[in-house]
């Protein structure tokens, strides 16, 4: 999948670079995406690409890491 959050669907937006002389050229604002391991309600662990807002809001639950003795 491209540069898109798998939870909220956030995608790149288009804007402009604006120079000192006010010349505008196109640019892209990319979302801050991170690949994290997500634990599904069934207990399955899957790697998903999510934006940092979804991570901070708790939309993604990380799996519990258990230390072996």
Curated annotation (Swiss-Prot):
Pfam families to which the protein is assigned, alphabetical: Ribosomal_L28
GO MF entries: structural constituent of ribosome
Cysteines paired by S-S bonds: none
UniProt xrefs under InterPro entries: Bacterial_rp_bL28, Ribosomal_bL28, Ribosomal_bL28/bL31-like_sf, Ribosomal_bL28_bact-type, Ribosomal_bL28_sf
Keywords recorded for this protein, A-Z: Ribonucleoprotein, Ribosomal protein
One term under GO cellular component: ribonucleoprotein complex
UniProt-listed GO biological process terms: translation
Statement: the UniProt record of this protein carries the keyword Ribosomal protein: yes
Keyword Phosphoprotein appears in the UniProt entry: no
Classification via HAMAP family: Ribosomal_bL28
Family note: Belongs to the bacterial ribosomal protein bL28 family.
Protein name as catalogued: Large ribosomal subunit protein bL28
Originating organism: Nitratidesulfovibrio vulgaris (strain ATCC 29579 / DSM 644 / CCUG 34227 / NCIMB 8303 / VKM B-1760 / Hildenborough) (Desulfovibrio vulgaris)
């Amino acid at each position: 999948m491209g540069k898109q959050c798998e939870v909220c669907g956030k995608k790149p937006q288009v804007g402009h670079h604006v120079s000192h002389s006010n010349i505008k050229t196109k640019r892209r604002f990319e979302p801050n995406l991170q690949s994290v391991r997500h634990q599904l309600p069934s207990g399955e662990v899957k790697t998903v690409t999510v934006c940092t807002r979804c991570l901070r809001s708790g939309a993604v639950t990380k799996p519990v890491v258990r230390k072996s003795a």
